[in-house]
Regions:
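Periplasmic-binding protein-like
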Residues: 1-7, 70, 74-117, 136-149
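Short helices/loops that flank or line small-molecule/ion binding pockets
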Residues: 15-16, 38-39, 52-71, 79
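Short helix-initiation/N-cap motifs at beta->coil->alpha
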Residues: 10-12, 46-60, 95
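Flexible hinge/capping segments at coil-to-helix
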Residues: 5-23
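Ligand-binding clefts/hinges and TM-proximal coupling segments of bilobed small-molecule sensing domains
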Residues: 31-48, 87, 117-149
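Sec-exported extracytoplasmic/periplasmic mature domains
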Residues: 8, 22, 41-44, 59-63, ...
Length: 149
């Protein structure tokens, strides 16, 4: 998870964001909302219907930062550099990607997909797909400083 901080905001840790004087926007009910609520309970958290509305609050100066996943924060700030700076608060707090399957007695399909994912992660395919897709929107691996894919 990252924060897009307003220009001039020089915070580096989750503890620094966990301050009653810091205003954070999130999209309500999202994983960003859960992380900000858990790691920054002292901060003023503003919840919006969408991530776009949370970004608009940042652009308007109504909040100091927006909590959002890295892939989105990099894309958003690449498209609109005036939005703010991407901050990867420490300690790094990451999320997993998940897929849901209908519960079935026969677990063959689920096990096949899990095996396929692990095999392709081991080959570096998942990483290369992420890097190539981010390059399509102008983001290089160098832009993902501090994060190992």
């Amino acid at each position: 998870f990252t924060m897009i901080g307003r220009k001039g905001l020089d915070l580096k840790t989750w503890e620094q964001f966990n301050d009653p004087n810091i205003r954070i926007s999130v999209d309500a009910g999202s994983s960003q909302d859960q992380v900000a609520t858990r790691l920054c309970p002292k901060a003023q958290i503003s919840r919006f219907k969408t991530a776009d509305e949370a970004a608009a609050a940042l652009m308007a100066g109504r909040v100091d930062a927006q909590c959002i996943v890295m892939m989105l924060s990099l894309t958003m700030t690449k498209k609109n550099p005036n939005l703010g700076n991407v901050i990867i608060p420490t300690p790094v707090f990451a999320t997993t990607s998940n897929a849901g399957f209908r519960r079935e007695a026969d677990k063959t399909w689920r096990d096949y997909v899990n095996t396929w994912i692990e095999f392709n992660k081991g080959l570096g395919l998942i990483r290369s797909v992420i890097v190539k897709n981010m390059e399509l929107v102008g983001i290089s691996e160098a832009d993902m400083a501090g994060i190992t894919l």
